[in-house]
Amino acid sequence: MARSVWKGPFVEESLIKKVEKQKLDPKKMPIKTWSRKSTIIPEFIGVSFLIYNGKKFIPVTISEDMVGHKLGEFSPTRTFFGHTPAEKKGKPAEKKK
């Protein structure tokens, strides 16, 4: 079920404070976050984040197209190695009579 409109998007309070603090700082270091569930709001545009995927931090810079999505959508947690090609698969078992 979708979140109620009257509640507004969920954004971790500490994340908002860090973004406001970074906008005043001239160094522009990426913000390290574990909050994959936070929604990207327009104030985040142009800010760099390091989003934790369960193993390492993935660098992401927020653009206009990302507004409204969750931070976790841009930090995949699983590695896809592809499907096994047909020639590498074993031969099917022969039926016994």
From Swiss-Prot:
User: Which InterPro entries does this chain map to?
Assistant: Ribosomal_uS19, Ribosomal_uS19_bac-type, Ribosomal_uS19_CS, Ribosomal_uS19_SF
Annotated coiled-coil positions are none
A molecular function GO annotation: structural constituent of ribosome
Biological processes annotated in GO: ribosomal small subunit assembly; translation
Alphabetically ordered keywords of this record: Ribonucleoprotein, Ribosomal protein, RNA-binding, rRNA-binding
Q: Which GO terms describe its cellular component?
A: cytoplasm; small ribosomal subunit
Q: Which domain of life is it from?
A: Bacteria
Protein purpose: Protein S19 forms a complex with S13 that binds strongly to the 16S ribosomal RNA.
- Protein name in the entry: Small ribosomal subunit protein uS19
